[in-house]
Amino acid sequence: MAWSASVRGLGQRVLACSRELPGAWRTLHTSAVCAKNRAARVRVAKGNKPVSYEEAHAPHYIAHRKGWLSLHTGNLDGEDHAAERTLEDVFLRKFMMGTFPGCLADQIVLKRRANQVDICALVLRQLPAHKFYFLVGYSETLLSHFYKCPVRLHLQTVPSKVVYKYI
């Protein structure tokens, strides 16, 4: 009996102390740690893995052997809204992947010129022409109304995925 009374008293003292410390209730994190380190390049296999030109070169070759996949002035010194443009880029890429499911042959290139957004992509010839034209018009119209600026899709069709080399 005396033991339970002392434990109860200890618990009340801990609660009293934690109420005095601001933020003491929010310091315990119970989520699992996910510390994965991965290089942003394709792993070398047995020579049977097809890769595109963008995937074949490591990220440190940007502006030397390969170009940027998002062209805008948001990252220049003194420019605002770089984070918003990055989120817009992620949304546009996911929108295009969902609108053309399994039809994109390579990465999408996003270009911002003044008040216009240009989306350039290689598309596989898996859809009939009338469905393809409908999806292009649907995407341009919906994105133009959403971003309140002209959005143009510049798409090229290819018969199969373009393979640069096998790794």
Swiss-Prot record:
<keyword id="KW-0687">Ribonucleoprotein</keyword>
<dbReference type="GO" id="GO:0032543">
    <property type="term" value="P:mitochondrial translation"/>
</dbReference>
<dbReference type="GO" id="GO:0005739">
    <property type="term" value="C:mitochondrion"/>
</dbReference>
<dbReference type="GO" id="GO:0005763">
    <property type="term" value="C:mitochondrial small ribosomal subunit"/>
</dbReference>
<comment type="similarity">
    <text>Belongs to the universal ribosomal protein uS3 family.</text>
</comment>
<keyword id="KW-0809">Transit peptide</keyword>
<feature type="transit peptide" description="Mitochondrion">
    <location>
        <begin position="1"/>
        <end position="35"/>
    </location>
</feature>
<dbReference type="GO" id="GO:0003735">
    <property type="term" value="F:structural constituent of ribosome"/>
</dbReference>
<dbReference type="InterPro" id="IPR026146">
    <property type="entry name" value="Ribosomal_uS3m"/>
</dbReference>
<keyword id="KW-0496">Mitochondrion</keyword>
<comment type="subunit">
    <text>Component of the mitochondrial ribosome small subunit (28S) which comprises a 12S rRNA and about 30 distinct proteins.</text>
</comment>
<dbReference type="Pfam" id="PF14955">
    <property type="entry name" value="MRP-S24"/>
</dbReference>
<dbReference type="GO" id="GO:0005743">
    <property type="term" value="C:mitochondrial inner membrane"/>
</dbReference>
<keyword id="KW-0689">Ribosomal protein</keyword>
<protein>
    <recommendedName>
        <fullName>Small ribosomal subunit protein uS3m</fullName>
    </recommendedName>
</protein>
